[in-house]
């Protein structure tokens, strides 16, 4: 397996969206506009795809458990929808454990560490050990440990006291342009407190002095019960549109987090599990499904509680050409 933790060099590149494409405003965000934005980002997303020749459609995840020895589980849209638990998920995961299936939560949420994510899921009634959760925050930490940029590194999005890169000076940024100018690279973990001031300072700083930008979370939105939260990739798309160099992405669908997940699956199961027996269960074609297809594991699209709830899923698949191995409604 290739080692995606190590990148021999970093090259700053620009990208121009098609002149006819306009990034949707936040008030106009819906499933279709999210797919359109992802599609316009496809040139710098993983490009290899071993599309399924036969997509299996089933009502529930529990109906297809016998196809897997390990399952990677997205959080939003699979385990929870905002602060609400996805109905039936606890019983299905209990059945999976009874069958000896190794479970691993793989989330693009990078604002918090795995301890906090474990506690958040536990509050909903879902019990995972800390080792059964991998976030793109962790992927960023490991990738940057192997590939240290010239310091200091400016951190945006809840650095806390636990985001540590050995032998690299990490500085939690504030809304002060002069501080941005003092760092040699940036990592964007989350955008919970993001606003136009943050956006303008980062954009102006990177245009004035191009430097590396690492983005831990490639999600455009996250599904909640009745709306979507706006996630880092949406704001980064505006940076790209304004002439900032392309960032280096570290979450799904990009391979670093999947390699980290494969290593963790081996540790948890105590054995080598063939890629054909590992499934990624997610709600989004361009992150969960594209990432799984590109990495060579099986992809499972859950449609009822995430991005595509109340949407014509077949239309979205035809539009994108991203074909899951399995399509299910819920757990």
Each model region followed by its residue ranges:
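Asp-based, Mg2+/Mn2+-dependent phosphohydrolase catalytic module
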Residues: 2-101, 112-134, 141-331
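Short glycine-rich or small-residue beta-strand-to-loop segments that form or flank ligand, phosphate
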Residues: 102-106
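Conserved phosphate/oxyanion-binding catalytic-loop motifs
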Residues: 109
């Amino acid at each position: 397996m290739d080692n995606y933790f190590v990148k021999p060099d970093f090259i700053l590149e620009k990208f121009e969206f098609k002149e006819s494409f306009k990034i949707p405003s936040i008030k106009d965000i819906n499933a279709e506009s999210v797919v359109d934005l992802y599609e316009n980002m496809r040139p710098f997303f993983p490009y290899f795809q071993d599309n399924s020749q036969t997509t299996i459609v089933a009502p529930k995840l529990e109906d297809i458990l016998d196809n897997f020895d390990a399952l990677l589980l997205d959080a939003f849209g699979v385990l929870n929808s905002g602060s609400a638990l996805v109905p039936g998920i606890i019983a299905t995961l209990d059945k999976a454990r009874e069958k000896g299936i190794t479970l691993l939560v793989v989330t693009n949420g990078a604002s918090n560490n795995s301890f906090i994510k474990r506690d958040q899921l536990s509050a909903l009634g879902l019990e995972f050990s800390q080792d059964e959760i991998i976030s793109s925050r962790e992927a960023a930490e490991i990738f940057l440990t192997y590939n240290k940029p010239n310091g200091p590194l400016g951190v945006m999005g809840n650095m806390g006291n636990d985001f540590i890169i050995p032998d690299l000076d990490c500085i939690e940024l504030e809304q002060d342009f002069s501080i941005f100018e003092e760092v040699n690279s940036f990592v964007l973990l989350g955008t919970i407190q993001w606003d136009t001031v943050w956006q303008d300072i980062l954009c102006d700083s990177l245009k004035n002095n191009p430097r590396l930008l690492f983005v831990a979370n490639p999600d455009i939105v996250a599904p909640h019960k009745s709306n979507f939260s706006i996630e880092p990739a949406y704001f980064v798309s505006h940076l790209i549109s304004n002439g900032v160099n392309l960032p280096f992405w570290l979450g799904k669908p990009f391979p670093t987090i999947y390699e980290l997940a494969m290593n963790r699956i081996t540790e948890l199961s105590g054995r080598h599990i063939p890629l054909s027996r590992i499934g990624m269960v997610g709600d989004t074609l361009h992150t969960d499904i594209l990432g799984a297809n590109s990495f060579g594991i099986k992809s499972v699209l859950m449609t009822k509680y995430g991005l595509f709830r109340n949407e014509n899923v077949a239309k979205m698949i035809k539009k994108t050409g991203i074909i899951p191995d399995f399509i299910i409604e819920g757990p």
